[in-house]
UniProtKB/Swiss-Prot annotation:
Residues 58-81 have a biased composition (Basic and acidic residues). GO terms for biological process: sphingolipid biosynthetic process. It comes from Arabidopsis thaliana (Mouse-ear cress). The gene is LCBK1. Expressed in roots, stems, leaves and at higher levels in flowers. Pfam families: DAGK_cat, YegS_C. Residues 34-81, 561-603 are annotated as: Disordered. This is Sphingoid long-chain bases kinase 1. Keywords: ATP-binding, Kinase, Nucleotide-binding, Transferase. One of its GO terms (molecular function) is D-erythro-sphingosine kinase activity.
């Protein structure tokens, strides 16, 4: 009976799940082990088999449903359909049938054969379900990320199209644990059932910001006989006309010395083919001297690089291009030109940190995909000379700047290892560094993530009541005052092109000092006061004692002199983002409490009847603040916000972002972001080799901030002055400068745009 039952239903053995079979075997063995009677086994087996047959029949009925086809005892993970909330591939763009043609390129075949590529392809090769989502192309069990796709090539009138991509290749089984995955070019040739479906597929790729290279029919390209051209489509399908984007124009500035001379090979062998696939029109210029990239960026015709400037090299060439763009005759043009980065140097901290790109192929793909990432810029101004230099990564003083200076001697001999050699030599003969540091702390954020404004002494309601009381007696100001206030908040092109006085002042420029928006309103309202000679009180610390501290010019003359004087672009340029000024506080200190000069003309030249003793006054010396309670109540006290540090420092680093190094674990400023409007200042207090060695050892693992002598502060402006017997040098984004006197670093929010989309915030 048992044998006949098994023979009649041979499929039962396959239908029974493995888990249930093991349970039945255990039950059968337990019966034999317990010495059960033989008459129990023929009674038990038919009942269990009948139940299993019924269960299998029910399962067969369920699987016959065309909508639900679950397999028994199988875990399913639906990543493309079903529940929309569990869709991991984004929204659906287009779906249909496709066949992957794995044959080699048919470029050498006859055009007629290309026109009908193996008419039996669809019948012989089974077409699979394919769909294009906002994140990937899925066909069968294969998937291709859209971030890896460069372009799509399509010949008019054909059923096939080619997808050009650079996916991450899988290493061999034995070496995959030791080698990093690399990207390589792969061309996927798909065949659609009809020409119309092929056009729809290509148009869908165009909707996902993929470059469409639409070519004419092969017969038209080869100029076949006119009799054959009557049946050949010539015009581009209307679905693809608007998807075919115009070729972007970019200027490529290549530093042939970057990366120990390998930047040329990286560009021509790796990056240039990707740009050509994407249809980018390039003009490649190789730098020949220091500062060549800055000259190109400051004088290049904007029509030649309307879509951006690509920098191939390290952080040094990027810094030159940035300073060239921001010192153009029209600064608005400089801000509008984005910068693309291809890492090919020994240090590329900017692109590693902001865009999360570490290899040239990924950098080229991010440039091809487009997108813009706004980045803050900091300005370093030399107070004595008025020279301004911009940066986007970090400015450093002390041991690191000395290592940078010493490494220039070993650049040709050691290449990227020159920093290690110079650091070791400088470590063995470590000097003592002393600095005077004053910084303006950034405003803290509350629990809701909004900036919490500090309580100020100005009561705007009382100020409004006071102004209305005087206006009822003297009349409202003229309508031109509104335009004057608006001109301060949004400077015109003419104002942007102007620079400051030819004589270098001891005070920082307006946007470097970070004037507060309320102070601008107060100064704008004070312009109706009669022009009077002003006397600046002598200060405790005068940076230039040879210059007299008395000025007989009126506020009007002083303001216009700063706006109309013309000087070289790099020196005391008054250009700056007003949005960045509005977010910053005034940077006057106790040691330098001079008044704020009005930067605009007076509204009236005739005397006004306003009470001079009750006029709205700007912050003045401490003697003026103590003269009356009313003046003290309406004058913001910004001197108390500045914090001073003086003593020995092994190093001072002012970071604009996290500043990741070659090793991903090395993060100089973990809490800094490229677009938060603040800078992170690291102070390494003290002196001695042991402290310096501990700092660099813990820097390898990102635990250097736990040291008791390391201080990290978020700041908006920093003043640094080297002490006596201290080697006065500083580095800005890998460029070395001499530190003569005091310098001030100030943040300019979102004054540069990088080509590419930034990933999520780094933890």
């Amino acid at each position: 009976m048992q044998k006949s039952g098994v023979n009649r239903n041979p499929s039962l053995k396959v239908a029974i799940p493995q888990a249930q079979q093991s349970l039945r075997r255990l039950g059968f063995c337990s019966q034999i082990a317990t010495g059960g009677s033989q008459q129990s086994s023929p009674i038990v087996f038919p009942e269990k088999r009948n139940k299993k047959v019924k269960a299998s029949s029910r399962r067969g009925e369920v699987t016959n449903d065309p909508q639900v086809k679950p397999k028994p005892d199988e875990h399913r993970i639906d990543i493309g359909g079903g529940d929309e909330k569990s869709d991991l591939l984004g929204s659906l763009v287009y779906a249909g049938k496709l066949v992957l043609d794995k044959r080699k390129s048919a470029s050498g075949k006859d055009a007629t054969e290309i026109q009908q590529p193996a008419a039996t392809d669809i019948s012989i090769k089974k077409a699979v379900d394919a769909k294009l989502t906002s994140s990937a192309l899925v066909w069968g069990s294969d998937m291709l990320q859209l971030n890896d796709v460069v372009s799509v090539t399509y010949n008019v009138g054909l059923r096939h199209f080619t997808v050009h991509a650079y996916p991450i290749g899988k290493g061999s089984c034995g070496l995959s644990c030791f080698t990093k995955p690399k990207r390589s070019r792969k061309d996927f040739r798909f065949v659609a059932p009809t020409v119309e479906e092929a056009v729809q597929w290509v148009a869908s790729f165009g909707d996902q910001q993929c470059f469409i290279n639409c070519l004419p029919h092969p017969l038209v390209a080869k100029k076949q006989a006119s009799s054959e051209l009557f049946s050949v489509p010539i015009d581009t399908p209307p679905e693809l006309v608007f998807r075919c984007k115009s070729a972007p124009k970019m200027l490529v500035i290549l530093n042939p010395r970057s990366g120990h001379g390998r930047s040329i090979k990286v560009f021509h062998n790796v990056v240039e083919p990707i740009f050509k696939l994407a249809g980018i029109k390039m003009e490649v210029v190789k730098t020949t001297k220091a500062g060549h990239a800055r000259e190109l960026a400051s004088t290049v015709d904007i029509n030649l690089c309307s879509d951006g400037i690509i920098c191939v090299g390290g952080d040094g060439i990027i810094n030159e291009v940035l300073n060239g763009l921001l010192t153009r005759s029209n600064p608005k043009e400089g801000v509008s030109i984005p910068i693309g980065i291809v890492p090919a140097g020994s240090d590329n901290s900017l692109v590693w940190t902001v865009l999360g790109v570490r290899d040239p192929i990924s950098a080229a793909l991010s440039i091809v995909k487009g997108g813009l990432t706004a980045t803050d810029v900091f300005a370093v101004e030399w107070i004595h000379t008025g020279i301004i230099h911009f940066g986007m990564t970090v400015s450093y003083y002390g041991f690191v700047s000395d290592v940078l200076e010493l490494s220039e001697k070993y650049q040709k001999r050691f290449g990227p290892l020159r920093y290690f050699v110079a650091g070791f030599l400088k470590f063995m003969c470590l000097p003592k560094y002393s600095y005077e540091v004053e910084y303006l702390p950034a405003q803290k954020e509350d629990a809701e993530g909004k900036i919490r404004l500090e309580k100020e002494a100005v009561d705007m309601q009382d100020l409004y009541t006071d102004v209305m009381r005087r206006s009822s007696r003297e009349g409202f100001p003229r309508a031109s005052s509104l335009s004057s206030i608006d001109s301060i908040m949004t400077p015109s092109v003419g104002e942007l092109d102007t620079c400051s006085s030819t004589h270098a002042s001891t005070e920082p420029s307006e946007y470097v000092r970070g004037i507060d928006p309320k102070m601008k309103r107060l100064s704008s309202g004070r312009r109706d006061v009669t022009a009077e000679p002003e006397v600046i009180h002598p200060q405790a610390q005068s940076t230039t004692p040879n210059w007299p501290r008395t000025r007989s010019k009126s506020r009007m003359d002083k303001g216009w002199m700063g706006l109309t004087s013309v000087q070289d672009p790099p020196t005391r340029c008054s250009w700056g983002n007003t949005g960045g000024q509005d977010r910053e506080d005034i940077s006057s200190t106790v040691s330098d409490p001079g008044p704020i000069w009005d930067a605009g003309p007076k509204w009236d030249t005739e005397p006004s009847a306003w009470d001079v003793e009750n006029s709205i006054e700007l912050p003045g010396p401490p003697e003026d603040i103590e003269t009356g309670l009313r003046k003290q109540s309406i004058t913001p006290i910004f001197e108390d916000k500045w914090v001073s540090r003086k003593g020995h420092f092994l190093g001072i680093m002012v970071c604009n972002h996290a500043c990741r190094t070659v090793q991903s674990s090395q993060v100089v400023a973990p809490n800094s972001e490229h677009d938060d409007g603040t800078m992170d200042m690291l102070l390494v207090h003290g002196c001695g080799r042991l402290r310096l060695l501990r700092f660099f050892i813990l820097l390898q693992t990102g635990r250097h901030l736990s040291l008791p002598y390391v201080e990290c502060v978020k700041v908006k402006s920093v003043k640094i002055k080297a002490g006596k017997n201290t080697h006065d040098s500083c580095g800005i984004d890998g460029e070395l400068f001499a530190l003569h006197g005091e310098v001030i670093s100030t943040m300019l929010p979102e004054q540069c745009r990088l080509i590419g989309n930034a990933p999520g915030r780094h933890s």
